[in-house]
Swiss-Prot record:
Ranges of residues in domain ABC transporter: 82-330
Protein name: Protein white
Compartment(s) where it occurs, according to its Swiss-Prot or TrEMBL record: Membrane
Chain sites annotated for binding ATP: G119, S120, S121, G122, A123, G124, K125, T126
Transmembrane segments: 431-451, 456-476, 506-526, 534-554, 563-583, 647-667
UniProt entry keywords in alphabetical sequence: ATP-binding, Membrane, Nucleotide-binding, Pigment, Transmembrane, Transmembrane helix, Transport
Annotated membrane topology: Multi-pass membrane protein
Amino acid sequence: MGQEDQEFLIQEHKKRTATSVESLNNTPGTLEASAINSGFSKSYGSLVSNESASEKLTYSWCNLDVFGEVHQPGSNWKQLVNRVKGVFCNERHIPKPRKHLIKNVCGVAYPGELLAVMGSSGAGKTTLLNALAFRSARGVQISPSSVRMLNGHPVDAKEMQARCAYVQQDDLFIGSLTAREHLIFQATVRMPRTMTQKQKLQRVDQVIQDLSLIKCQNTIIGVPGRVKGLSGGERKRLAFASEALTDPPLLICDEPTSGLDSFMAASVVQVLKKLSQRGKTVILTIHQPSSELFELFDKILLMAEGRVAFLGTPVEAVDFFSFIGAQCPTNYNPADFYVQVLAVVPGREIESRDRISKICDNFAVGKVSREMEQNFQKIAAKTDGLQKDDETTILYKASWFTQFRAIMWRSWISTLKEPLLVKVRLIQTTMVAVLIGLIFLNQPMTQVGVMNINGAIFLFLTNMTFQNVFAVINVFTSELPVFMRETRSRLYRCDTYFLGKTLAELPLFLVVPFLFIAIAYPMIGLRPGITHFLSALALVTLVANVSTSFGYLISCASTSTSMALSVGPPLTIPFLLFGGVFLNSGSVPVYFKWLSYFSWFRYANEGLLINQWADVQPGEITCTSTNTTCPSSGXVXLETLNFRDKFTFRLYGLILLILIFRIAGYVAXKMRTKRKE
């Protein structure tokens, strides 16, 4: 590297840094130094005890090539069509544009060492960690020639997940839970089934104390920008605590200090350092650490443009960059210098990429790289392999019933605390029921009253449908990323999630229809009698649950909330048209007849009208106008609409639709999790 490049980097660093590195190095009372040198780490006693790890893992990888699809923007409808094509069509033979993200990367992480992956934004740090943790996103492909080994034994995703904890950069939580409730759920499904619930709760208390979460343990996590809750630093510590519950032998952390102040960043890295000293293998990415934090790293891996620019100790890094003519200036933070040397400078892209290519080429043929290759061959030749026991070979830590119980508990608490699901919906239901009741108040048994009652009954169905579909889409799509991550981490099965969530939300979907019918039914003056009331209540309750199931299906088939909200109404309208109000059931075209059997509007509207008019005898309906058709009895009113008196058939139809939509939603979510694996 030329003198001009070095001067340019130094000037850039001076512009970005308000306080000189020299003053930081000469001031022993800096925040990071105080965190490291003080007794702060003593509060982590139980988490970082001196006990040796049960299993020590050397993680090595070689010839790692990662390719990603080039994103092609499109509308929500186009994305939905592509998803449907992906489900029913074999896309393997359709060539897609790809980008080479990680290029022939090799490396090794030893037990007892803290390996820090550094590089500028876009260097490939997160992509590398996702590949190492077998958590690559959809559309990202790992080359078949890539080798990933633990103790010289090639591993797959299941073996890695049994031994590795992965703290990802973005924190995903159920925002309505408290920090303690979240950790209780995580401990229940993460920790071995041989442990009692009391032991798991003791571990939760221990981790809460270790990571300084005592003050915020009963604070709701919240949703950034929507519901106030934990701070960014507290959320990051909570994510770390979730993974620390099981005390894993291999820990991979993507930007664990992101969003933390300097004191907490230093404390978190100190904890990771202590974990590595216990014999654990720790890999983390970090963006431009302070000089104090940089000294904690046993090894550093510098990434640039998807390639390895250096892998070795900090001392070896100084020698390497000095050898290639890029010596770090005196009193300059080495981490800042390396990142800036390997960054693509705006306006100097060609020159920067040429410099990066030369650095990576020099490392590939250098002494450190050759020694690493020899060590890799020695590791691959080992025969000790991996320990095999029940805890590492079992797919899920918790039993099926434990998973189901934990999910049902979490879903029930979340439902009670979610304002959109409880308070707002109850108020909305009451207001709409009162409004409809006032508009159609005490309808008389006349030909006009018959028309009004029929319209009011159909309003029951449209209100229940759209209220539940949109409520589910708004809440469930926000929870889907959490579901996807937790199922990929093998915390629970897809079927236990769906069953537990369904049963937890069932009381709400029983209360809302009851509240609505209890208000609107008597105000309108519908057919009196407890039997008629309960029949109407049963039908409206089933409609609420069918529409909820349909909302689950849309949510599971959509990639985002905006997409689900865009496609939800157009998909609902066809079912509404077959309800018998806009189109007589006897006039449905033959080619659409099959679709009418999936319309819950049809079954419910027919059932409610049969319940209302089937036993109305001739003479009960008063004809007050000679200019309009007047049904002489309830049977005539039903025949006009082409309805048959088969009430139980409508009930069975709605129950069947609930099962169909729930199963379809489960299959959609299951296929998404399969594609992610």
